[in-house]
Design a protein with these regions (language model features):
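A general structural motif
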Residues: 122, 143-148, 168-170, 213
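Conserved residues at the C-terminal ends of beta-strands
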Residues: 104, 143, 236
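Residue-level signal for short, function-critical loop segments
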Residues: 83, 146, 239
Length: 262
């Protein structure tokens, strides 16, 4: 398994988005250096280039660099963000007809350039993957999502995307059951750390109350990967206030990595 660190911040709507680069670097220091790669991210914000997507120029450059980095890997990749838009290239890299996508995220990321309140890509990335045909909507599971825009609710309903609430995640098999029922043969796991309860995990730009407990998320991942092979994974949105705060949250992130590695 190879770790690919992508300290991208340009997809975030937050005025403190640069903390995402700090978070990616903090995670990198806990990873085995021999099996870790780093994708360079432009220093500049980038412009929208007529797309309606803020900072699109830089986001597209990073997507291409990440795609190139993944192409040369001999094994499964865990991509470390940065903002959660890094999952775009990572999911496309492993796309096939049997792929399921589990999206652990407080937000569904189902906006488009015409519906997004912020115009930033982190809130559009899942919609973009569906539009590109990278994954069948019937094999997408949103888990732990609890803050929706109206347009996102409409898209999830129209596409038939399955949803598992925070309460339903008390059953460690809930996600695995939904994925297996879809007929998938392998699974990509996207984890935006804001899916976690901010009372347990502090390093977030936009903490949303009443999230998933770490023990529940770890148990869910283990159950899922006990039933289907892992195609790849993302851990994104770590944004510690300081190096000291990063140390406090590190054990949680390492538990999630251990669950993904099996």
């Amino acid at each position: 398994m190879t770790f690919v660190v992508v300290p991208q911040w340009q997809g975030s709507p937050s005025s403190r988005a640069m903390r995402l680069a700090d978070g990616a670097e903090a995670i990198r220091t806990d990873l085995p250096s021999a099996s870790t790669r780093v994708v360079p991210v432009p220093l500049e914000a980038g412009d929208e280039q007529g797309t309606g997507i803020a900072r699109f120029g830089s986001i597209q450059a990073v997507r291409e660099r990440l795609a190139d980095a993944l192409e040369g890997l001999p094994d499964t990749a865990i991509v470390i963000g940065g903002d959660c838009a890094v999952s775009a290239a990572a999911v496309v890299h492993v796309a096939d007809p049997g792929l399921a996508l589990v999206w652990f995220d407080a937000h569904p990321d189902l906006n488009t350039p015409t519906t997004s309140p912020s115009g930033t890509y982190a809130g559009m990335v899942l919609a973009a993957l569906l539009e590109e045909g990278a994954v069948d909507p019937s094999r997408v599971v949103l888990a732990g999502t609890r803050e929706w825009d109206a347009a996102e609710e409409d898209m999830a309903r129209e596409k038939g995307v399955a949803t598992i609430t925070v309460g339903q995640l008390a059953d460690a098999a809930a996600v695995a059951d939904a994925v297996v029922a879809s007929g998938a043969t392998r699974v990509y796991v996207h984890i935006d750390l804001d899916v976690l309860d901010p009372a347990e995990f502090e390093g977030l730009l936009e903490p949303i109350p009443f999230g998933v407990q770490t023990t529940q998320l770890v148990a869910t991942i283990r159950e899922l990967l006990g039933r289907l092979p892992l195609a790849g994974a993302t851990i994104a949105s770590f944004a510690p206030e300081s190096p000291e705060k990063a140390v406090d949250d590190a054990p949680t992130i390492l538990r999630l990595i251990a669950a993904l590695r099996g």
